[in-house]
Amino acid sequence: MLISGKRSIPDMKTGLVVEGGGMKCAYSAGILDRFLDEHITFDYCIGVSAGSANTASYLAGQRGRNLRFYVDHLNEPGYMGVKNLLRTGQFFGLQYIYQTLTNSDGADPIDYPAIVENPAEFELVATDAATGKPVYFTKDDMKQDDYRAIMASCALPVMCRPISFKDQTYFDGGLSDSVPIMRAFAKLSLIHI
């Protein structure tokens, strides 16, 4: 972990696990903003469901972006609701959230180049709809204006349609690995999480 540019424990890799949970992720959004304020960084980050989206904004260095999605965009017609369900078949508008708003020409774009340039390893958990097993995407699975890895991580059954990506179909990562601490330990043999 880096705090104000200095490694707190020499030669020790650190990780950040950000769970999902819908609107309760507004809390983790505030924590991630505080990490940005204090210049706290991690070697490895993994997010699940809404936590994967929060982690992406954190790695992009976009303080306040996550909060806008929980407060400002929440009442927009394409975001979520019964009308959205009747119009699109989905309660949560993943395409609206992670394309219309998030793309480079959207109302609240994510700084994709900053994610790529961030030295932290980043994984996002999704659930393979055929096997029920977790799948771990990386930032290499994302491209500018193609955030299907995040959408797959957030595709809560019944509330959203599954996401087709890389010749597979995926649901929310919380179904298969809701708090991926063991993945973090196994991935980098981390000591501090």
Where are these regions (language model features)?
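Patatin-like phospholipase
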Residues: 1-48, 56-192
